UniProtKB/Swiss-Prot annotation:
GO terms for biological process: regulation of translational initiation. PROSITE patterns: W2 (PS51363). It comes from the Eukaryota. Transmembrane segments: none annotated. It comes from Mus musculus molossinus (Japanese house mouse). Translation initiation regulator which represses non-AUG initiated translation and repeat-associated non-AUG (RAN) initiated translation by acting as a competitive inhibitor of eukaryotic translation initiation factor 5 (EIF5) function. Increases the accuracy of translation initiation by impeding EIF5-dependent translation from non-AUG codons by competing with it for interaction with EIF2S2 within the 43S pre-initiation complex (PIC) in an EIF3C-binding dependent manner. SUPFAM superfamilies: ARM repeat. This is eIF5-mimic protein 1. The modification N6-acetyllysine is found at residue 117.
């Protein structure tokens, strides 16, 4: 069947839809209305909030969200890169914006409230505002130092009250910002403002949720991406909590790697001497304390075996396995605190793995005989340093052995007095 050309109406004028007709002029109309309203409200931020609330029904905030936020922050529409589009025409700009505000926490916090109210009223602006802040952080080079400081304070306060997610910080990892030192400098100001709103635990928790806790070193150029450099920079800036947090994160990462490598070596049944040398090198290289290492060793040793599910057989299996690795544990339990950590680890393991409940005392006695644990450590654990998990069961198991230790100690003391 042949396709016939559709007839065309001649002499008919098609009316342009009203929306399409004025779209061309809307950005400037939007800007002019916003600038005029902000200038009329002046420094009265309550009046600004009311103006923005009521004007949302007349202006298309959804379509021109970037213009809205550009003007509220910078006082003008911004071109790509961050330069002011209307820099030469003061009638198209306003001085009643974040960048023109006083550089103090309370003033910027009041501006943050304007954004909070606006986004609560027009929920659809939430994502647009997040995108705007990511964009503004990319434009930092175009802003003056004072403007950068105010933007950092605003960002920190909004992160603190939950208006913004920590993911906006990914913009700071841009090469140009990092190389020129802008990223680190901005981050310090931002974190100070954030911590003025929330405690350090809340801040670090947000960083973890956004998977940024492991990326903080990226605020610095590659040749300065060390924990020591980060710690000094942030501690000197009065943010020791962040320095400590990063050290802990790095230490946890190091421990995970060490545990993985140890697990591999134990599964390959490497000679104990080799394992000792490897662990000592890692301790020195990563500044790891013995108390951390002894816990890792215990975990790795216990993970190296498929344990029997029968309670009456597992104790014998455990003693045979632990006797083999007692010399390894002995090397890294040379301090009283390390011995207590090991005792608590054994206690927790036996409590968490029910088949081991009755094996606790036998394991402790084995370690005592193998010079892994001293009587001083065992007595201290018994009297005051035991964990809460299953303590009544384990203290009862240990009662006779502890009495024997105490009697032996008394006998040796009396023999010393006689001689």
């Amino acid at each position: 069947m042949n396709k016939h050309q559709k007839p065309v109406l001649t002499g008919q004028r098609f009316k342009t839809r009203k929306r399409d007709e004025k779209e061309k002029f809307e950005p400037t109309v939007f800007r002019d209305t916003l600038v005029q309203g902000l200038n009329e409200a002046g420094d009265d931020l309550e009046a600004v909030a009311k103006f923005l609330d009521s004007t949302g029904s007349r202006l298309d905030y959804r379509r021109y969200a970037d213009t809205l936020f550009d003007i509220l922050v910078a006082g003008s529409m911004l071109a790509p890169g961050g330069t002011r589009i209307d820099d030469g025409d003061k009638t198209k700009m306003t001085n009643h914006c974040v960048f023109s505000a006083n550089e103090d926490h309370e003033t910027i916090r009041n501006y943050a409230q304007v954004f909070n109210k606006l986004i609560r009223r027009y929920k659809y602006l939430e994502k647009a505002f997040e995108d705007e802040m990511k964009k503004l952080l990319l434009f930092l080079k175009a802003f003056s130092e004072a403007e950068q400081t105010k933007l950092a304070m605003l960002s920190g306060i909004l992160l603190g009250n939950g208006t913004l997610p920590a993911t906006i910080l990914t913009s700071l990892f841009t090469d140009s910002l990092v190389k020129e030192g802008i990223a680190a400098s901005f981050a310090v100001k931002l974190f100070k403002a954030w911590m003025a709103e929330k405690d350090a635990n809340s801040v670090t928790s947000s960083l973890r949720k956004a998977n940024l806790d492991k990326r903080l070193l990226e605020l610095f150029p590659v040749n300065r991406q060390s924990v020591d450099h980060f710690a000094k920079y942030f501690t000197d800036a009065g943010l020791k909590e962040l320095s400590d947090f990063l050290r802990v994160q790095q230490s946890l990462g190091t421990r995970k790697e060490l545990q993985k490598e140890l697990q591999e070596r134990l599964s390959q049944e490497c000679p104990i001497k080799e394992v000792v040398l490897y662990v000592k090198e890692e301790m020195k290289r990563n500044d790891l304390p013995e108390t951390a290492v002894i816990g890792l060793l215990w975990t790795c040793i216990m993970n190296a075996v498929e344990w029997n599910k029968k309670e009456e057989l597992v104790a014998e299996q455990a003693l045979k396995h632990l006797k083999q690795y007692a010399p390894l544990l002995a090397v890294f339990s040379s301090q009283g605190q390390s011995e207590l950590v090991l005792l608590q680890k054994v206690q927790e393991y036996c409590y968490d793995n029910i088949h081991f409940m009755k094996a606790f005392q036998k394991i402790v006695v084995l370690f005592y005989k193998a010079d892994v644990l001293s009587e001083e450590a065992i007595l201290k654990w018994y009297k005051e340093a035991h964990a809460a998990k299953g303590k009544s069961v384990f203290l009862d198991q240990m009662k006779k052995f502890v009495e024997w230790l105490q009697n032996a100690e008394e006998e040796s003391e009396s023999e010393g007095e006689e001689s």
